[in-house]
Amino acid sequence: MSSLPRRIIKETQRLMQEPVPGINAIPDENNARYFHVIVTGPNDSPFEGGVFKLELFLPEDYPMSAPKVRFITKIYHPNIDRLGRICLDVLKDKWSPALQIRTILLSIQALLSAPNPDDPLANDVAELWKVNEAEAIRNAREWTQKYAVED
Amino acid sequence: MDSDNDQDFCDNVDSGNVSSGDDGDDDFAMEVDMPSSTERQLETDDYQYKVLTTDEIVQHQREIIDEVNLLLKLSTPITRILLNHFKWDKEKLLEKYFDESDDNTEEFFKCAHVINPFNKPTEAVRQRTTRSQCEECEICFSLLPPDSMTGLECGHRFCLSCWREYLTTKIVTEGLGQTISCAAHGCDILVDDVTVTKLVPDARVKVKYQQLITNSFVECNQLLRWCPSVDCTYAVKVPYAEPRRVHCKCGHVFCFACGENWHDPVKCRWLKKWIKKCDDDSETSNWIAANTKECPKCSVTIEKDGGCNHMVCKNQNCKHDFCWVCLGSWEPHGSSWYNCNRYDEDEAKAARDAQEKLRSSLARYLHYYNRYMNHMLSMKFENKLYASVKQKMEEMQQHNMSWIEVQFLKKAVDILCQCRQTLMYTYVFAYYLKKNNQSMIFEDNQKDLESATETLSEYLERDITSENLADIKQKVQDKYRYCEKRCTVLLKHVHEGYDTDWWDYTE
């Protein structure tokens, strides 16, 4: 494997030195481009109290292309599908090399606070979110309790 | 186009070959010689289009920029971005620009993703550009002296090597040209072509970039179209965008408006519908609907290919006995000779009618499709004919004929192909046409052109010997003149119909 670019080394260091509240990203012991991520559900959202596991991978041409991020913990959210894939503009066409792991994870946390059912990835969830928001939020709470809260 | 053979002796020469017995009914629809529209030329010469090479396109692009800049007096890269924003419609750009010049200049440049060039540099930009100590590049996190950093007017600065990598990725991997924006997050200010060329040292990437911006210039400019022929690098420039026949230098003839092969008499929108219809599987599903039913028990699709109406489903897990006609269970039909007592029930009748309708619409489609495809295939063969005709022409010159005397053969193949192509598209036109008096005249014209075209094709496939040469030449010439004339008549008739609203459509 080619040596790790300065950008990744520095970024990882800073991430460790100044962690973001509610977000925890630790590089894998064997692969410095692979991060084990934990995001806590934001307060005042149906995901409150949940601890969500994600995986994050920095591709070969990072930061020219966006990191690949996926939820591992099951989550009931209109912009996240069954496989944990996330529909988020900054992970796709709005990616800029000046963005970082930190900013991306913050965006994901913000997405939990503000689901966007008009740009859905999980169609059934988005549909319910639009026609019966109360029930959708109830489902999201249930899923959070069931899959994202450790006893 | 050449119209040197518009001598009108075609009518009487034709009667000559009716006697040769190959076209039986020749009471063709000559009554199309209606008043008006005689002055209308099918291939008008007032449509002055030009075929441009890639270099000429680039040159043309520069001319437009210079022209606009005489009025705007901005820098060339900015004018280029503005023009691209207005899809290279310079009138629109100028109109907007002078319309909004007083209070809305800011908005005008913002929409085009350019920093207003009349703005004084903001405090932040000035500070950054005059800073002497090292800055950190937000992409690679390196601390670098200011002369290693650069940025656009928006003030976002990154190091030269990150810019290089960023632009290269955008150009090579993402195929972006004129629409690459600043590397900062959320900044939509566009990178101009001069900056790109300056920051990207790799010659291959530069070439690719040039191709991309030239391509977007042609694609978004309404007066330009790439020749759709494979590997052709010419583009056609027209004075105004219309469905017109244009002839590329590579030899390809196409419709400027839609880029398909020249398709007179059918209009672009019907041809588009037709191609889509032929391409997708809608007809396959029509066929399934018309020819199959589903087993009422297990829903497996069944094609009945003969036999009686007592069906036994072949699905080994089902083996259901039912009546093909009413889809009811076979049992009540009894053991007597089949006598479906539910046959006339309303429901069954409705189902039958629906199936009948699908069947006839399928038959109708296939009628037009087969004829359309047939001419298309023949046209491919006629292209081979050019080679054999060339050989024939050489042979004939050895039989003491002069070069000019044998040119009729090539001309004949030209006309044959032209007629085939027209015929092909007449079937698309006819498919969408509702029947009325004019459509019947059209069909007569079509029939007449078709039979004459087939005869011409036949003549051209005959062996030419020194004995029959004079005879064949006469026949071929007579026939192609006739075909050409009938083709013109047919097209004229359709065009007249467009002008005077004769045509009703089925959809």
Curated annotation (Swiss-Prot), chain A:
Please provide the record's keywords in A-Z order. Answer: ATP-binding, Nucleotide-binding, Transferase, Ubl conjugation pathway
GO cellular component terms, alphabetically, are:
cytosol; nucleus; perinuclear region of cytoplasm; UBC13-MMS2 complex
Q: Which SUPFAM superfamilies match?
A: UBC-like
Q: What is its EC number?
A: 2.3.2.23
Gene3D superfamilies on file: Ubiquitin Conjugating Enzyme
List residues traversing the bilayer. none
Under which name does UniProt file this protein? Ubiquitin-conjugating enzyme E2 N
What is reported when this gene is inactivated? Mutants in this gene exhibit several, largely neuronal defects including lesions affecting the neuronal connectivity of the giant fiber with the 'jumping muscle', and the axons of photoreceptor cells R7 and R8 fail to make the proper right-angle turn into the medulla (hence the term 'bendless').
Cite the active-site annotation: C87 (glycyl thioester intermediate)
Query: Which terms does the UniProt entry file under GO BP?
Result: axon target recognition; axonogenesis; flight behavior; grooming behavior; jump response; peptidoglycan recognition protein signaling pathway; photoreceptor cell morphogenesis; positive regulation of JNK cascade
Q: Which GO terms describe its molecular function?
A: ATP binding; ubiquitin conjugating enzyme activity; ubiquitin conjugating enzyme binding; ubiquitin protein ligase binding
